[in-house]
């Protein structure tokens, strides 16, 4: 049985829902807290976590009267306790405290801890059988098969919080799995959609951070510019909805109004539309199986006027093609894809490589890892973390060579 409910059975959510937000001070966390703020009568905050932002975490804890808060940096525990002195709010720090936050008895958990660090706390929430709004990519990209198996066995409900996957989740409710022919994930095309390949190669950090539609964190904005984020989303969709690579298409849609579509066997295509605002998919997750009042601007199609679509250009944006290759290779290759991309993006931000070298480093790392015969099924979180570490080391070792080729 899938942990993602493809048919949205209408079981009314009654009473006050207890919620925990892992990654409360990040961009996804900000959107989540904004929605909670708008409906205080519906939600009780159980636990909140942050990476290092003690001031922001303490402010939210006081505002929402959280019962437990945790900061990932152990050195910040005394600072957190001082900020919450006299409140009676329990405090923790370090990786174990983040896991403890996930283990606390909340009905609904937003899993928005970035990176591989989010895997273990998200699994802790899954193991309780909670409703988990999944915003952490690594759970699926690095550990998709066993993550979804574990969620199904625990009776957890996985609610996709990413805009594209949430769109597919909503559209898939219009039919049965055996009636599906393919899903279509939309991509804005990013800031370099119309740029020539030579110009993309030389793009600066400031240019890569100028996304035309979405307001996001630095890493995901750069991933959008390279279309690596769309590659990650293809991988995620495969595990979330049990799809083969051939059942997942990507189309460039510059207006970012249609977020995802599903084609069924009768050739009907069901699409989900909305303003480009992360509060819309998060609101869907927060209210599911019901709907709550959203905070995004209403969609005005007459004002938008035109919706356009283009095929993705794999030559100018090779990162998307590499995602399909990693998905077909299996046995940890998607973990390598993600890890190498993170190393490459960090190097680009540090001005150690050109923008165009991001995909080349990912490709070379994947090739080297496969040539070394490292492929093996991943059966637990520690397996995924080990492959992640190995791939990061391999990418770091290849970095000078890639940088030299581009200079």
Swiss-Prot record:
The keyword Coiled coil does not apply. 1-deoxy-D-xylulose 5-phosphate binds at residues 137, 163-164, 188, 211, 224, 229-230, 233. Pathway: Isoprenoid biosynthesis; isopentenyl diphosphate biosynthesis via DXP pathway; isopentenyl diphosphate from 1-deoxy-D-xylulose 5-phosphate: step 1/6. Keywords: Isoprene biosynthesis, Manganese, Metal-binding, NADP, Oxidoreductase. One of its GO terms (biological process) is isopentenyl diphosphate biosynthetic process, methylerythritol 4-phosphate pathway involved in terpenoid biosynthetic process. It catalyses: 2-C-methyl-D-erythritol 4-phosphate + NADP(+) = 1-deoxy-D-xylulose 5-phosphate + NADPH + H(+). Catalyzes the NADPH-dependent rearrangement and reduction of 1-deoxy-D-xylulose-5-phosphate (DXP) to 2-C-methyl-D-erythritol 4-phosphate (MEP). This is 1-deoxy-D-xylulose 5-phosphate reductoisomerase. It comes from Rhodopseudomonas palustris (strain BisB18). The gene is dxr.
